[in-house]
């Protein structure tokens, strides 16, 4: 009797089973890779990655976005942080609109504080701007001024007694550059930040021309462009109730964060995540 031949069918079955198991394992691995790539593609969106434009507000400068910029660049985004001129709402909005026209492709436009009013006007009618993100920001309606908005919801620390107004050449009569007094800045703008950081920010703040507070806003971009809002719940400059009222009116997706008026400095990760939400929702 040939014992080898008798054993062969059993060995063949073992070989076949091993091959089937190997193929099954390979298919599972390929499926997992495909699923991961599908998830990555979904996260990236179908269209080109938008450029992110960050607009600072009054009593700040472009460095206020440093923590957000680093995170966005690490994710592969092209980021711009143009200097907001702070000369007046029509001028600043026109300047930003021209800057946006220098960028190719889709844009997610982010504004902090007074920068929110600027993006509200600059993006109107611009098809490149796919999303607006307001960070502790003004989102005025047509015909409103920032002074009117602040008067409608008392509690702001940015009152005349907190300001130092300095004349500048060529300014219209009664107009000057307004600074937050250095003694007031930490509690007004930077409450919750380390004292050393708050004092540096007080020294490096950029002033805003007082006329910007009384100039009427134009047709708001948030009427036609999807909007998001980061609302600092301990903001002493723009009262929480006012921020929420403006965000609700703009039908913005709202994220509350325990932060002062400078939430992009105190909570850059949260602000970055909201920007990325806007990117994904509009890609």
Language-model features: where?
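C-terminal region of N-terminal signal peptides and the immediate post-cleavage residues
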Residues: 26-46, 283
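Active-site catalytic motif of lipid deacylating hydrolases and related acyltransferases
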Residues: 44-103
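Gly/Ala-rich beta-loop-alpha elbow adjacent to hydrolase catalytic centers
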Residues: 110-115, 119
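Flexible "cap/lid" loop of the alpha/beta hydrolase fold
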Residues: 128-129, 133-173, 209-211, 238, ...
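Conserved alpha/beta-hydrolase catalytic His-Asp/Glu region
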Residues: 174-207, 211-220
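Conserved serine/cysteine hydrolase catalytic core
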Residues: 203-250, 255-268
């Amino acid at each position: 009797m040939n014992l080898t031949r008798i054993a062969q069918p059993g060995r063949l079955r073992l070989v076949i089973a091993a091959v089937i198991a190997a193929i099954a394992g390979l298919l599972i691995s390929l499926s997992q890779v495909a699923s991961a790539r599908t998830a990555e593609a979904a996260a990236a969106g179908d269209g080109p990655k938008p450029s992110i434009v960050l607009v600072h507000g009054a009593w700040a400068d472009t460095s206020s976005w440093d923590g957000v910029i680093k995170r966005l660049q690490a994710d592969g985004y092209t980021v711009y942080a143009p200097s907001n001129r702070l000369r007046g709402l029509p001028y600043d909005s026109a300047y930003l609109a021209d800057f946006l026209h220098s960028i190719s492709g889709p844009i997610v436009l982010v504004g902090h504080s007074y920068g929110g009013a600027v993006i509200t006007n600059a993006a109107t009618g611009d098809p490149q701007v796919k999303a607006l993100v307001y960070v502790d920001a003004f989102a005025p309606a047509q015909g409103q001024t920032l002074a009117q908005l602040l008067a409608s919801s008392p509690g702001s620390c940015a009152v005349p007694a907190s300001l130092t107004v300095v004349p500048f050449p060529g300014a219209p009569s009664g107009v000057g550059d307004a600074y937050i007094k250095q003694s007031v800045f930490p509690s007004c703008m930077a409450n919750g930040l380390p004292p050393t950081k708050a004092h540096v920010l007080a020294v490096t703040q950029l002033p805003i021309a007082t006329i910007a507070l009384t100039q009427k806003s134009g047709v708001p971009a948030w009427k036609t462009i999807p909007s998001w809002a980061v609302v600092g719940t301990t903001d002493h400059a723009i009262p929480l109730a006012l921020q929420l009222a403006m965000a609700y009116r703009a039908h913005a997706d709202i994220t509350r964060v325990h932060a002062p008026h400078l939430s992009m400095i105190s909570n850059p990760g949260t602000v970055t995540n909201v920007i990325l939400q806007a990117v994904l929702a509009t890609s």
